[in-house]
Regions:
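Transmembrane helical elements of multi-pass membrane transporters/channels
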Residues: 12-31, 131, 142, 165, ...
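Short runs within selected transmembrane alpha-helices of multi-pass transporters and secretion channels
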Residues: 64, 132-150, 158-166, 191-207, ...
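Small-residue-rich hydrophobic transmembrane alpha-helices
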Residues: 43-106, 139-158, 258, 271-335, ...
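N-terminal transmembrane alpha-helices
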Residues: 2-33, 37-38, 54-66, 70, ...
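Short alpha-helical transmembrane segments in multi-pass integral membrane proteins
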Residues: 1-17, 71-137, 183-241, 297-362, ...
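Transmembrane alpha-helix boundary and packing residues in multipass membrane permease domains
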Residues: 17, 21, 32-33, 69, ...
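Helix-terminus/linker motif at the lipid-water interface of multi-pass membrane proteins
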Residues: 22, 26-44, 112-119, 175-188, ...
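Transmembrane alpha-helix boundary/anchor motif
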Residues: 30, 66, 103-107, 116, ...
Length: 439
């Protein structure tokens, strides 16, 4: 029997993370709407650049997740000064990763004209790309502070900062895209500058809170007294790279599935995009709660409390299942109307309706893999996660998508039927590994 205290603690920790994640989705919707209303060309250019940067930011966020189990374990042991020292090393590691990714993205920028994009969009893409590139290092440094705060169970500070940052971003969009309050009308470039500004502001605000808050006093002491050291730096890389690769592979597999959908034509691609937008909503909610599982598990792991580790992960999965049912029920009931919210095209609306059932089937697997990949992160057992992700997404899911979609000729529905196979197999393998490690 799992004590109700586990559910209460997870909700208290997880809901602020979920709210922060939902804020990111709302910002994505707002960006798309505001750029789209300014110009169709701007929207097309933003679509390409944002897709490239989303993959990089997901990879970068995954790397920063290596900090959570270290901080959570030290916090569980009551070693607050060591937490501050670890944060110093995490800022160093994340900063270097930011520089590495920036250099990589500069290489891509130099070859952007070779990527087969419409010539007329390149003058819009280039400045927007560069402005987002400048924001990459602030994102990495903010992520280090966020994972530190999550690890010491302070999930509310990052939540309020993300809400504030998103609000500033939307206001900045309104001012700079359309040219309000005396500013010139900058279109897509304005959206990029608004994003960069909000990312710098929330980073500087978090630094100010860390340096001035009484709550962080003991961690600040550890931060100032602690030294950059090789063991902490190597441990952060040892935990960060596998999580980054796991999250990157999951995202890449969905991107490759999108390429297969493109072979079926524009209508299939439009229906796929609608469902991916809806799917992201569920995924972000699950991942927010699963991040709380990682924190709780790491706290109990630091105390060598195996029962607490297992009960926390089970309670997290139960809460995510409740979320999945909450998401799936209205979608099932409204499956014939959903497509019409996004488009007037009757064919696309019918296709969207046909994808709801495979979407609902994979919610169980998505919840399972979110929970137990994060539970494994909590006990710092991350290397197998990378191998499992490769097997599930590249050996099982993508070939199944091709088989169902094109060999069996089930089309778009066939490609979507491969997602439950990939996500559920990943979830089961993560769960089995977690059970083995927590006997």
């Amino acid at each position: 029997m799992i004590a109700s205290s586990h559910y209460k603690a997870l909700l208290k920790l997880g809901l602020p993370i979920v709210i922060g994640q939902l804020g990111m989705i709302i910002l994505g919707f707002a960006d798309t709407l505001m750029i789209g209303h300014h110009s169709t060309e701007g929207l097309a250019a933003a679509s390409f650049v944002n897709n490239v940067f989303n993959l990089v930011i997901i990879f970068a966020t995954g790397f920063s997740y290596g900090l959570t189990p270290i901080v959570g374990s030290l916090f569980g042991k009551g070693e607050q000064k060591a937490v501050g020292c670890t944060l110093k090393n995490a800022l160093w590691a994340n900063g270097l990763m930011g520089i590495f990714l920036t250099a990589l993205m500069m290489l891509l920028y130099a070859n952007i004209h070779r990527l087969g994009q419409p010539e007329e969009l390149l003058p819009l893409m280039r400045p927007y790309y560069l402005v987002l590139l400048v924001s990459l290092i602030p994102v990495m440094l903010f992520n280090a502070f966020k994972q530190f705060a999550d690890g010491i169970t302070d999930t509310q500070t990052p939540m309020w900062l993300l809400i504030g940052g998103n609000t500033l971003n939307i206001i900045g969009n309104w001012v700079l895209i359309y040219g309000h309050l005396g500013f010139p009308e900058m279109g897509l470039l304005g959206a990029g500058i608004a994003t960069l500004s909000s990312r710098i502001i929330i980073l500087l605000t978090f630094i100010g809170i860390f340096l001035g808050s009484k709550r962080y006093h003991i961690y600040r002491t550890g931060f100032l007294q602690g030294k950059l050291n090789k063991p902490d730096f190597l441990q952060l890389n040892k935990l960060g790279w596998p999580v980054a690769l796991q999250m990157g592979m999951e995202t890449a597999s969905f991107s490759l599935a999108t390429i297969m959908v493109g072979w079926l034509g524009a209508m299939a691609l439009a229906a796929h995009q609608v469902m991916m937008t809806i799917g992201q909503l569920g995924y972000m909610m699950y991942y927010g709660m699963a991040a709380a599982v990682a924190v709780r598990v790491s706290n109990f792991h630091g105390q060598h409390d195996t029962e607490g580790v297992r009960h926390s992960s089970s309670a997290g999965f139960h809460l995510i299942l409740v979320m999945a049912v909450t998401v799936a029920t209205p979608l099932l009931l409204l499956r014939h109307q959903i497509g019409g919210w996004f488009t007037d095209n009757a064919e696309v609306t019918l296709m969207v309706a046909s994808l709801i059932v495979p979407f609902i089937i994979y919610q169980f697997g998505d919840g399972l893999q979110c929970t137990y990949s994060n539970a494994l992160r909590g006990i710092a057992d991350v290397k197998p996660v990378m191998y499992i992700a490769f097997i599930a997404y590249f050996i099982i899911s993508l070939p199944a998508g091709y088989l169902f979609g094109f060999v069996f000729d089930w089309g778009l529905t066939g490609i979507w039927l491969s997602f439950p196979f990939g996500l559920t197999s990943a979830g089961l393998m993560f769960w089995l590994r977690f059970r083995q490690q927590t006997k």
